[in-house]
Amino acid sequence: AVRTQSIAASPPPITTTSLPAAKGKAAKTISPEDMAVIRRQAEEFMEAKDRLPELATLVNERDWVFTRNLIRGPMQPLGREMLYINQRLLPQDRKEADKRAAELKTALAELDEAARLQDGSRLTKEYSRVASGFGAYAEMIPAEALS
């Protein structure tokens, strides 16, 4: 109903023959409002992703405390950011985005646990999962939101 109202309210008046085409097109694009939310959340996501080199240094130095601080501090809101993005993606993309977000959150939790246990080999393995998780999830963000 919301899409019909926004289509009907937009000038010029739409004839009944063009309305089904407009509805079909609306289902395949992200609304400007949703794209604005995605853009804001994607910016936060990319800021966390940009801290991967810092996290890698902490992992390589076996800096248990600051590894955990980075995960629990600046990277902590990632779950919420990905949730907000996923809710506004096209319906056909949401399941895969949810899967990739869950994998990244799990990898971060496992990295945090490896640092807590001071397990160096596990820390290195989990960092690799975190880095690939960031890359995999970033592919779900529409290019328009990153420009």
Q: For each predicted feature, which ranges?
A:
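N-terminal plastid-targeting presequences
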Residues: 1-147
